[in-house]
């Protein structure tokens, strides 16, 4: 897609080069010093030296709701000798916010001035001016104010802020952006009109256009500079990484069933494959607490009529979805749009457990696993075996 060269907030260089997959953060709390480059995908070092001891969770719900295997995460976070401090900053009392040691309110979009970037669609890009409508309520501060206060106490305020407020940074970045995008109006004009759009002057985006026109002069970022069918980099990884049984990394695009597949012996106990999907009433878990959206777009488990008939399940019946990791109670949607042997839950529903940890909100991550995908060490959210019964 076409995007505008709008200048963004500069970032300081992080002196720490060691990193892990975001999905592995619970493992880094539980067994950090055991995690290695060859077994766990640690980058920048052969192994982690220390576990995670503090979490700063800003405007995110990955602490609980959007992270796999909620019950395991809950147990890890219960022990405050492991992760000793959790700071959460948000506008809503999310599932993640309930696990905070320090919980701070963030300013809403209506309470501060900002730019909305990353707005592009096909051959058109746009920038939105998000103006302040009301003053921050009570003692709310913007995240820029919070981090500036932290920088002040750490002795690096000038290096961090460069002497600018949030609005002054916006004006500074906008002036730089006007040099790259001459069509931009003045700051005050843009503030009044609220949005700026620009179409791709080339008409439409052509993927890898320069490479296609001259592959020698414009190589890709692959080791060979070409589109690779056989990946030597993957071959090297497959030969050196320590993979658990069932995990496969191959230099060629091949089929591999993976763990918790229909071929897994666990299939006898949990015969249904549970997959997730992005639901129309939410962006992940954002808007998952809005009552009118929840009423208009009910959270349901989709199931094929053949699987439903075997279990005496009719459309709208309350069912229990369960495996060794947890249990969810939710209504069933019986539909031929699902393949036999497969059920589905829209991801992002807000976790709502009872006293026995049975979730009544339809949160798929009660049932997902924290076993990472083989290569990226990422979220295997569609790889879950479950059983379904009528309640």
Where are the language model's segments positioned?
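Alpha-helical scaffold elements adjacent to nucleotide-binding pockets in ATP/GTP-utilizing enzyme cores
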Residues: 72, 99-102, 146-149
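Long, contiguous, secondary-structure-rich segments that constitute the structural scaffold
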Residues: 139-193, 285-287, 291-302, 306-391
């Amino acid at each position: 897609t076409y995007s505008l060269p709008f200048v963004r907030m500069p970032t300081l260089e992080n002196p720490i080069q060691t990193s892990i997959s975001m999905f592995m953060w619970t493992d880094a709390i539980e067994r950090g010093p055991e995690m290695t480059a060859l077994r766990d995908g640690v980058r920048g070092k052969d192994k982690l030296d220390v576990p995670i001891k503090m979490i700063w969770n800003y405007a995110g719900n990955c602490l609980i709701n959007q992270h796999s295997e909620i019950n395991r995460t809950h147990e890890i976070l219960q022990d405050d000798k492991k992760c000793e401090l959790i700071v959460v900053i948000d506008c809503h009392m999310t599932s993640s916010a309930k696990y905070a040691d320090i919980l701070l309110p963030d300013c809403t979009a209506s309470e501060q001035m900002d730019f909305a970037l990353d707005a592009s669609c096909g051959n058109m890009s746009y920038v939105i001016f998000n103006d302040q409508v009301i003053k921050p309520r009570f003692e709310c501060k913007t995240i820029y104010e919070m981090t500036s206060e932290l920088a002040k106490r750490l002795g690096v305020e000038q290096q961090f802020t460069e002497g600018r407020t949030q609005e002054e940074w916006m004006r500074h970045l906008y002036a730089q952006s006007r040099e790259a995008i001459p069509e931009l109006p003045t700051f005050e004009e843009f503030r009044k009109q609220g949005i700026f759009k620009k179409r791709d002057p080339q008409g439409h985006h052509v993927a890898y256009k320069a490479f296609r026109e001259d592959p020698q002069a414009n190589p890709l970022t692959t080791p060979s500079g070409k589109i690779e069918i056989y990946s030597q980099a993957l071959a090297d990884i497959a030969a050196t990484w320590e993979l658990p049984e069932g995990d496969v990394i191959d230099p060629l695009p091949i089929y591999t069933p993976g763990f918790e597949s229909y071929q897994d012996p666990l299939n006898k106990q949990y015969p249904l494959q549970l997959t997730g999907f992005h639901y129309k009433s939410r962006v992940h878990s954002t808007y998952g607490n809005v009552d009118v959206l929840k009423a208009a777009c009910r959270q349901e488990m989709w199931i094929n009529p053949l699987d439903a008939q075997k279990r005496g399940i009719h459309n709208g019946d309350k069912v229990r979805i369960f495996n060794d990791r947890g249990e969810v109670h939710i209504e069933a949607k019986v539909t031929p749009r699902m393949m036999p042997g497969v059920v589905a839950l829209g991801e992002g529903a807000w976790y709502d457990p009872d006293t026995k940890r049975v979730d009544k909100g339809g949160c798929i991550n009660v049932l997902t696993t924290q076993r990472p995908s083989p290569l990226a060490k990422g979220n295997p959210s569609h790889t879950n075996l479950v059983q379904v019964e009528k309640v």
